[in-house]
Each structure stands twice: as structure tokens, then as C-alpha cells.
């Protein structure tokens, strides 16, 4: 670890795929409480800008921090990627503090599209922020556009809170001149912020929250000490369904269960977690997980690898102390309990955006202050991989699981999805057969539309047959290379329970690079949040799908795009009753 005079921390991480990865602690949307919710997220969208033909890049805003990364591709170099990312924050050697109203307006529209996307595909319910005075969704809404000047002032104010002590930088290689470049830019920031934010309100403990969730989860408040953080790292590397959350200076260990009986035993104090010393901790974490640790605990004064001897040699005492603290919090009701609930009728409170939720007090009724049993935890395997075809009945459940667990990755191709994970076969089956997970997986049917129409365009099966088997979709014909013939009509209007645009496009020079560039152009115009595309077996032919509230504008953009020599697009209007009759009148494609 290299520490600049203003406390910027720089790490060389030659294992990561990114060229540069930067995080800013104490800079997430928890800072929006008592201001305009969404300022942090809007700032993230305003800052990131790059040439998608030369770079891959992204950014994210969480409760307590913001992070950005950039990777060079094609003819660009690592040095180019580093300078591109730094340019998001500095202009002519000075920290950016000017944002045009037109750009703010476009990005607010993009935020509304992101809200729509996330609520169609996920359940975006941030319980901790809500209990601390924020909302269940804190990413920004379209009504921010009514206060553009105030929003701009808040954005400038937020930039002035950045200080060296908040900055963490991972670089793949620290090339010649790179360290000096960092000193001239992020190293020029004050060690402490020019504007000190107000303290984050303390979340309320001793609550039961009934909300959509794939698991029965208990958030246990523990002290944010070094030993507890090392204990969390030990548990995270060893077991599934254990993680942590922070808000302000508070730390919660999150423990999830698939069995309601075990969950209730844990809550009543009659059972403790069965934690055993079963392996050596290697700290082989992803760069995302490492960055999150440094940002959530900015007071860490050493490289995490400096603690690898301590976490292994002292694991017994660390885990005993952590177990005792967990149990004390259960007895004292320093917990937030999440109980899976999918009823739209049950509600006893709402946030300012009128999202309904049930919040109850966690009482001491039935507490047993002497545990007499232990609960086994799901152990991690080194690695596992499965391939699921689009016709497999478990397709959507596996997609749901990957969306709910950050350590599961999936890649999509023309035939199916390849999933990498570290679960045993028995544990995967137990999760997917659990009552709460099944309800959660089916509570957001919008994600299925992407695969319904992919099946329609790629297989040649009728929409009636596909809809009749929507729980499993239909297996594609892959024995022969399909030749897709486009019909005369380029637009088919349907009514579904989501608003989206999808279809197939073909072009002589069409490739993934041009589609990514197209996606970023649509994002800059505020018309979409993201766009998925799948390369079909027919030459230069892709299937596109994007959720959007601006369907006509997106259709017009795609319809007039000169890269497409042929196209067939479906435009969906959101409604209570599905109507796909337009797809039955003509033969849209012939396979």
C-alpha cells in the first residue's frame, strides 16, 4: 500500500482485469438523507464518460461509497485508461465543479429509467436506509427535474466533500509517471473535506421488516472492530449466505436462512451458528470485495494481506468473540429481521415515494437465553460451473439466484447461460426448492419477457406455444444453423406487464462493439438504463432487449439506425392484461 501525503491509498493489484479501480468512501447515498434523495447516484452518472470503442468502464453508488473503474481495449493502453478515469474528476488540473443543466436533465431521465428497470427485475428495498430516515429506493426519481438549480448546487457541494482520506485506488500496474500523475491529481485534494457532511441518522434496531426476499435474513449489529472484520472475512470465505452491511459507523453481520425453523430458532436464542475452523483463509477475494472492505472501513491502516497471519493464527479466539457478540445482540434485540412477504395488501407504513412495507417491533417474547443446539451453515466449494439451456425449467430460478448473490456469475450465448458458482449440488437444490426462494423468483415475472421473445425470434416457435410454456420457455432448435428471414413490418406493438423494446437486428458491420456504443448513446440521451444483446447463430444478427419508459423514442432510434440493414422490433406498452395478438397476424420471421 502506498499512502500519499493527503492520505490517498494506492494498491497494486496485478490480478484484477480492470486497469484502474477507484473508490470514494463516505460518499454514497446515505449522504442524501435530509437532502434530495438521488444526488449521489446522479453525480455518478454525470461523472463517468468514455469512448466505448477503446474502453470498458462502469461505476456504482452504494449506501456508503461510490466506485469507478476503467479498462483499455483495442488500441488503447493501460495509461490511457488511467487518464480517462482521472478525467472524470479533474478538468485542467482542477476538481470538476460545473455541470450543465441540460446534462443534468438527461441523466435524471436516465435515473428514472434505472428505477423502472430495477423495480421490474429486482426488489429494490433498502431497509437500513429506510430505517435511518431515507427511502426504500434512494437512486433518484424524475421529480428531481423540477429543482434543477438546487440539484446543481448540491452536486457542486458534494464534489467539495471529496478528500484524500476518502480515496482508494487499485491499479493493475504502476507504470512510469503514473504515481506522479496521481500525486498531481488526487494527491492535490485536501486531506480532510472542505465541507463536512452532517452525521448519518442512526438506524432503528429491534425491528422486523416484512418485504420480498429470497431468504429469511437476520441483520445482527456488531461492533466495527478489526477482529470482527477479520471474523467476517473468515466467515465470508468459508460459508455461503453470510455477509455484512454498514450505514454510517454501524456494522451489521447478515445471516440468511432457507429453513424457517432454523431462522426462528436463531431469533429465539435457542440456537447458535455452527462455525468451525475448517480451512486456511487465503484472502482470495475479488477486487470488488476488497475495494468494498477498504471503503466501508476507511480507518484500516494496513493492506488486508498484512492480516493474513493473524486471521489464521488467531481464528479461534476471533470466532469465539464474534459468536458471543452475535448471541448478545440476538438477546438484546440489536437486530433487524427480514421476513419474506409477497403480499401487496399487507402494509402498515410507506416511504415518501409511497412504497408499501410492513415494519414491526422485535419483542422479547419466547426468548431462550441459553442455546441448546447449533445450526450448520452452507460451506463454499472452490469452484463449480453449470450450463443451462433456454429450454430448461430451472433457467429463471438460476437467473434469480445469480441476481441475488454477487458471487455468482453468468454468461449468455445463443444456446443458454453458463453459470459459475461455489455451491454444492445439494445446496443449490435446497435453495431453489425453498418456499421463500420460489416465491421470490416468481414475484418479478418481467425478467421472463427477455427470454420469451428471445425464444420467439431464435426458435421459430409460435408465440402461443411459447406463452403456454412460459415457465420453462422452449428449447431452441440448434442442430442446424437457422437462417432468419425478415418480414416487411419492422414494428409489432404488444401489451405486457412491463414496458420494453426488443427484437432482432442485422447489419453487415454489426458487432458487439457497435451495440455497446449504441447503448451508451441511448443512456446519454436518457432513454434507457441498460440494453442486453445476444449474438444469434445467423451471421451478423443480434437479439436486443431493453426495459424503458420511453418506448417510442427508443424504437425511433433503433428504426432509423443506419447500422441495421434489417430489423424486426417489438414495442411493449405496460398494461394489466397481456395482448400479443399482433404477433399472430403475420409471419414475422421464417426459420
Curated annotation (Swiss-Prot):
Cofactor(s) recorded in Swiss-Prot or TrEMBL: Zn(2+)
One GO term describing the cellular component: virion component
Main location: virion
Entry note: cofactor: Binds 1 zinc ion.
The keyword Protease appears for this protein: yes
Catalytic residues as annotated in Swiss-Prot or TrEMBL: 44
Similarity-based family: Belongs to the peptidase M44 family.
Name by which UniProt lists this protein: Metalloendopeptidase OPG085
Amino acid at each position: 500500500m502506498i499512502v500519499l501525503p493527503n492520505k490517498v491509498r494506492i494498491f497494486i493489484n496485478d490480478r484484477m482485469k480492470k486497469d484502474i479501480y477507484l473508490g470514494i468512501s463516505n460518499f454514497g447515498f446515505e449522504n442524501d438523507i435530509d437532502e434530495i434523495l438521488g444526488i449521489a447516484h446522479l453525480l455518478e452518472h454525470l461523472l463517468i464518460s468514455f469512448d466505448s470503442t477503446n474502453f470498458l468502464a462502469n461505476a456504482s453508488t452504494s449506501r456508503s461509497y461510490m466506485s469507478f473503474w476503467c479498462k483499455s481495449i483495442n488500441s488503447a493502453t493501460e495509461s490511457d485508461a488511467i487518464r480517462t478515469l482521472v478525467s472524470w474528476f479533474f478538468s485542467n488540473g482542477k476538481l470538476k465543479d460545473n455541470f450543465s443543466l441540460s446534462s443534468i436533465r438527461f441523466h435524471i431521465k436516465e435515473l428514472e429509467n434505472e428505477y423502472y428497470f430495477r423495480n421490474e427485475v429486482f426488489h429494490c428495498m433498502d431497509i437500513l436506509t429506510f430505517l435511518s430516515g431515507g427511502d426504500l429506493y434512494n437512486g433518484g426519481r424524475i421529480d428531481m427535474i423540477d429543482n434543477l438549480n438546487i440539484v446543481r448546487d448540491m452536486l457542486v457541494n458534494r464534489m467539495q466533500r471529496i478528500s484524500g482520506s476518502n480515496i482508494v485506488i487499485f491499479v493493475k500496474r504502476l507504470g512510469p509517471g503514473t504515481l506522479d500523475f496521481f500525486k498531481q491529481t488526487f494527491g492535490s485534494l485536501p486531506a480532510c473535506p472542505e465541507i463536512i457532511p452532517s452525521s448519518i441518522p442512526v438506524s432503528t434496531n429491534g425491528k422486523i421488516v416484512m418485504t420480498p426476499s429470497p431468504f429469511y435474513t437476520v441483520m445482527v449489529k456488531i461492533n466495527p472492530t478489526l477482529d470482527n472484520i477479520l471474523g467476517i472475512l473468515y466467515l465470508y470465505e468459508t460459508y455461503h449466505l453470510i455477509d455484512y452491511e454498514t450505514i454510517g459507523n454501524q456494522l451489521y453481520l447478515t445471516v440468511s436462512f432457507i429453513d424457517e425453523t432454523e431462522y426462528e430458532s436463531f431469533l429465539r436464542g435457542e440456537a447458535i451458528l455452527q462455525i468451525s475452523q475448517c480451512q486456511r483463509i487465503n484472502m482470495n477475494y475479488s477486487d470488488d470485495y476488497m475495494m468494498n472492505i477498504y471503503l466501508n472501513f476507511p480507518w484500516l491502516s494496513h493492506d488486508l494481506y498484512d492480516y493474513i497471519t493473524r486471521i489464521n493464527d488467531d481464528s479461534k479466539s476471533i470466532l469465539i468473540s464474534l459468536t458471543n457478540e452475535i448471541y448478545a445482540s440476538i438477546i438484546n434485540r440489536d437486530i433487524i429481521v427480514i421476513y419474506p412477504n409477497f403480499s401487496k395488501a399487507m402494509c402498515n407504513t410507506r416511504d415518501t415515494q409511497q412504497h408499501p412495507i410492513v415494519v414491526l417491533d422485535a419483542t422479547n417474547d419466547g426468548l431462550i437465553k441459553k442455546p441448546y443446539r447449533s445450526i450448520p451453515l452452507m460451506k463454499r466449494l472452490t469452484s463449480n460451473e453449470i450450463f443451462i439451456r433456454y429450454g430448461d425449467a430451472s433457467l429463471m430460478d438460476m437467473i434469480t439466484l445469480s441476481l441475488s448473490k454477487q458471487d455468482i456469475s453468468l454468461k449468455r450465448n445463443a444456446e443458454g447461460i453458463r453459470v459459475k458458482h461455489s455451491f454444492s449440488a445439494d445446496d443449490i437444490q435446497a435453495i431453489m426448492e425453498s418456499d421463500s426462494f420460489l416465491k421470490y423468483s416468481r414475484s418479478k415475472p418481467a425478467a421472463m419477457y427477455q427470454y420469451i421473445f428471445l425464444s420467439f425470434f431464435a426458435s421459430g416457435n409460435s408465440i402461443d406455444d411459447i406463452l403456454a410454456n412460459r415457465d420453462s420457455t422452449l428449447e431452441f432448435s440448434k442442430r442446424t444453423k437457422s437462417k432468419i428471414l425478415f418480414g416487411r413490418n419492422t414494428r409489432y406493438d404488444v401489451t405486457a406487464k412491463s414496458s420494453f423494446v426488443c427484437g432482432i437486428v442485422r447489419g453487415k458491420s454489426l458487432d458487439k462493439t457497435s451495440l455497446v456504443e449504441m447503448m451508451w448513446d441511448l443512456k446519454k440521451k436518457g432513454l434507457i438504463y441498460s440494453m442486453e444483446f445476444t449474438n444469434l447463430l445467423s451471421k451478423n444478427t443480434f437479439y436486443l432487449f431493453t426495459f424503458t419508459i420511453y418506448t417510442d423514442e427508443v424504437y425511433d432510434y433503433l428504426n432509423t439506425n443506419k447500422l441495421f440493414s434489417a430489423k424486426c422490433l417489438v414495442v411493449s406498452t405496460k398494461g394489466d392484461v397481456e395482448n400479443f395478438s399482433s404477433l399472430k397476424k403475420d409471419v414475422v420471421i421464417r426459420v
